[in-house]
Amino acid sequence: VPTLRRIVVLTAVGVLATGVAAAAAPASAPAGGAGPRPPATSPPPPGTAGGEAWAWTQLTAAGTRIRYVSTDTSQTCPAVRYSLGTTRNPYPMTRVSTPMGSQFPTTVCELAVPLAASNAVLEQSSVQAAVVHPANRQLPLPDWTSATRPRKVAVIGDTGCEVPVAGPVQNCADHQTGWPFPRIAANAAAVTRPDLVVHVGDYLYREDPARENDKAANPGCTTTAERAGWDCVVADFFRPAEPLLATAPVALTRGNHEDCNAAQQGGAGGAWFRYLADVLRSDGRCITYSPTASIRAGTLNLVSVDSSFADPGDTGSTAQAGVFTRRFDAVNQAAQQHPANDYFVFTHKPVWMVKAAGTLPQNVEWATHVLDAAVDATGLHRLADNVRLVLSGHIHLYQMLDFNTGRPPQLTVGSSGGPLDNGPDDAKVVGKEIGTPPQAVHQSITQEQAPGGRGVFGYAVLADGGGTWNLTFHDASGAVRGQTCALSTTAASKSFVCH
């Protein structure tokens, strides 16, 4: 694995305002890092012709993509020059979509980048936006090869600030204890410095921006009519996530908050498919069930299963199990093609997660029954041997649950920004039988302020341990909280050994 992260450098045009122009020259990256932290910038006023652009690197089933979204009026895409072996050539980004009404006043572009690419530069003359994020215009590329894997994977989930139409509103302006996602993203980038960031879904929570208390920071996302528009996508995800997007590529799966509206057009689901989905759409349409996406990060394979519409009411229903059985069959087929590689399933709703447990054996509440039933109905009646882990969110807690059987452990990371839930008493979870067929929980570690109490804000890290994965939970400051757990390497008894 190279010791220097490969960097994409975004070089802005010379017509920038003075403060932006001062930052136009790309800063040099220190060894092992992704460059200095970009300075804070303010977005241009709404309607500015020069507009504002956001760029990031995303892993997809079709490979690594550089994505670029701009509100400038040119409707053009920049070109990227990068090195590949001994050659260095420019490559134009492909325009995916043009502005579409008030919800999507953006031009969206993307470019496929080979795994071995390095030193990519956005051509100076091709950038039309007045402001580009990250402000230092540097974007990370994968620092693994086809024969290696990421050394450090950060897992986040349920990150948006909850502003519902009715009911309690999260304190979006308080980034310490109210809505700490901006702090979590900054500290994960600075302290953990991951090689890859996995987001397990739920990005867009501002259902009624008129009720939020951080309107001044988010022009264009302040009224009910503006919900799920581009400026709200920036407010809930791109602006707070900027330090992470400047540090590592991302792999994304969809959450239930990115659902379709009744018209299957626009809304949060339309925003997901326009900007963040594995395959982008230009028509504003929303699809209820996305295809499974198998994403390669060297010898680590991440398979995204869209569970955003699995049991919408969280009632324990198994309706539509067949839809998900087909997707888990696809997971198994992909895993069996590369039996020597590790596979992680990442899906928003957990397959096996305990929300509450009492003293009696039958007193246990777990999620998500329809996904569990779907796994049992696959051709294997289980997940493949080399599916080592399931990564999920949805429940606003951190929990590691294992069974010490062929069933992979369930890691739930729904604690990265949204209002926290109460968790179970882990002592009462151990030994409870859940799933199909019923299997006893071998180990349950839930990060809580007290047993059975409120969860703790933070994120998870999976570090390559030389043939295994070492799991840690990090609080909002980036500090490790609790034990370090090493994932076993045997297919018959998948579990964590914690110390």
Task: Name each model feature, range by range.
Residues 150-173, 299-312, 344-348, 408-415:
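Active-site-proximal beta-strand elements of phosphoester/diester hydrolases
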Residues 130, 135, 216-339, 361-376, ...:
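Extended active-site neighborhood of metal-dependent phosphoesterases/phosphodiesterases
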Residues 1-9:
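Bacterial Sec-dependent N-terminal signal peptides
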Residues 159-163, 203-207, 256-260, 307-311, ...:
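Solvent-exposed loop/turn segments at secondary-structure junctions
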Residues 200-204, 335-356:
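Short acidic, glycine-rich surface-loop motifs adjacent to enzyme active sites
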